[in-house]
Amino acid sequence: YLPIMNPNIAVFKPQLEDDIVRAFNQVPKLLSGEDLGKQAEKDYCFVETEDQFQNYREQFENAQKIVVDIETTSVSPHTGTILGIAMSTRPHQGIYVSVDIVNKHKQWFHNLFMDKLCIFHNSKFDTNYMETEMGFEFPNYEDTMLLHYCLEEAVGTHGLKPLALRFTDLGDYERELDEYKKSWARKNKVKLADFNYGMLPSDILAPYACKDADATFQLYGKFKPLVEKSEDFNRLYENILLPATHAMKTLEKNGGPINIEQVNWLAEQYQIDMEECLEEINTHEAVQRFERVYEKTFNPNSTAQLRDLFFSILKLKPTKKTDTGAWSVDKEVLTNLNHPLSEAILELREKTKMAGTYISNIKNGVDKDGRLRSGFNIHGTTSGRLSSSGNLNYQNIPRDNKDIKKLFKARPGYKIIQCDLGTAEVYYAAMLSGDKFLQKAFIDKLDFHSYVAKQMFNLPEEVNQVKKLHPNERQYAKAITF
């Protein structure tokens, strides 16, 4: 029993308080000689024959709720396939059914999932996969990931494995699989990024899948009562999070329409542009002088070399320091230098970023139907805002780059529209606080930041004139508001 966490950390990370208390409660048991590593007896089974399936069939039919968890070869049903379905009807149980048995009894599984309360961890992933590949439907389901998000909104704490480590007796059960994966990848000279669960033998994958199902059932038993105790938490979970995750699943299934011809053209054009930028940089007299003085090839991505080039070779005046005290060569500084070299380097940076972050990701991620599918998360922020991850962050499309925007093209008969919910947080604050001053701006449909600026700076103009006549004051008001 080795202490690895100072209890004072709970002051800065309150979400760890329960873990610390739980650890202290274990100390008397440890001192009394109790075996803290002892696990409850498990009922795990890999169902790969008809006889094995029949042994569990009645148990599933008689259960009121069933944990469902799938193992796949890819994160996307458009590029991967289901290997099997793990299920559980009680804690410490996990039944992993091979995909061959599932396909043989597909109608039975369809009826089962239609009739039972199905419990998932990250339901969006499992239901999307099974709906797409097998046509299953889940009219009644719960999600332990969203239950935990209600109880603890901290980012990065909602994964099944860390939650199982904190709240169940299963420990770090992914370790054996990870060790096998690394060993297999080394032996077969395969990159870990190219490894998929279809490469795992059943004696590794099946126990792992069973533990996924077991962990989910145990977490449901802990989280669901806690959420139900709070009227606010329960309303958030039932009325907002569950419907929202269903809506996000629809977004992910649909994906975004991509103009693949434009993607290919832009990839070639940006490559030409980047080569021209490099040519302009490398042939500049100052860069050649740099290479003679420092006896090395100039690297435009090196902050130290940029500093030497602009402030030692060109003798330009530095304007800003970094947190470490070194002269900065960030975008603002290079822009203010107003030098042909700094302009070329800024263009190279921008083109390189666009090519890597957007063009390459879109080109490599687009599916056969010409649509790009990525993730939308309702548990990815502490504020309750959505986040996007995967092939492309759909919430981070460059606002002013028309080249990138042209990569998205509506299918015939449709339009792509751009909407923005302005000052959303302030709207909620006005509604929840009952502040009449805040509410008036929205009731009268005024520009909120202009409205605040007029009051703050006692401006004589009408609210609708502030944005044009006093842009700086409006920006100050905006900064203070947020």
Where are the predicted features?
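Short, flexible loop segments at boundaries between secondary-structure elements
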Residues: 1-15
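Active-site-proximal helix-loop-helix substrate-binding element of RNase H-like nuclease domains
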Residues: 2, 31-48, 76, 80-228, ...
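N-terminal accessory regions of nucleic-acid-interacting proteins
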Residues: 13-70, 78, 105, 109, ...
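Acidic, glycine-rich two-metal-ion catalytic cores of nucleic acid-processing enzymes
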Residues: 61-64, 68-93, 99-102, 234, ...
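Secondary-structure capping and boundary motifs in well-ordered enzyme cores
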Residues: 77, 156, 197, 201, ...
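Short alpha-helical scaffolding segments that buttress acidic/His motifs in well-ordered protein cores
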Residues: 82, 145, 164, 205, ...
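Short His/Asp/Glu-rich catalytic/ion-coordination signatures at enzyme active sites or charged loops
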Residues: 190-200, 204, 242-273
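Short amphipathic alpha-helical coiled-coil/interface segments
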Residues: 209, 213, 244-247, 263-281, ...
